[in-house]
């Protein structure tokens, strides 16, 4: 089965959030078959920094939805959006 790489933009709910801790929480929340391939940051506004997390998932029905739901359920996450998707 082929795999898909997706860049997910994770917005914390406060500029005071520890991004390293948030990244660890996101990693722990991943569903089976998904893995984080890298994380970058993006300054948004007013001191708020988003995490740009590259996730590798199987190319099956549902795509990144399980990862989006898992990330959205993590404490201190305001929103999750898909920025890019591509086949590997």
From Swiss-Prot:
Keyword Ubl conjugation: no
CDD domains in alphabetical order: EF1B
Record keywords: Elongation factor, Protein biosynthesis
A Pfam family matched in the record: EF1_GNE
Record InterPro entries: eEF-1beta-like_sf, EF1B_bsu/dsu_GNE, Transl_elong_EF1B/ribsomal_bS6, Transl_elong_EF1B_B_arc
Signal sequence, start to end: none
Function: Promotes the exchange of GDP for GTP in EF-1-alpha/GDP, thus allowing the regeneration of EF-1-alpha/GTP that could then be used to form the ternary complex EF-1-alpha/GTP/AAtRNA.
Entry-linked HAMAP family: EF1_beta
Protein name: Elongation factor 1-beta
Gene name of this polypeptide: ef1b
């Amino acid at each position: 089965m082929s795999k898909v790489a997706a860049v997910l933009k994770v917005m914390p709910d406060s500029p005071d959030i520890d991004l390293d801790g948030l990244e660890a929480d996101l990693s722990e929340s991943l569903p089976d078959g998904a893995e984080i391939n890298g994380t970058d940051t993006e300054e948004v506004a007013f001191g708020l920094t988003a995490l740009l997390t590259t996730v590798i998932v199987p190319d099956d029905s549902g795509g990144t939805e399980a990862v989006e739901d898992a990330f959205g359920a993590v404490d201190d996450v305001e929103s999750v959006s898909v920025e890019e998707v591509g086949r590997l």
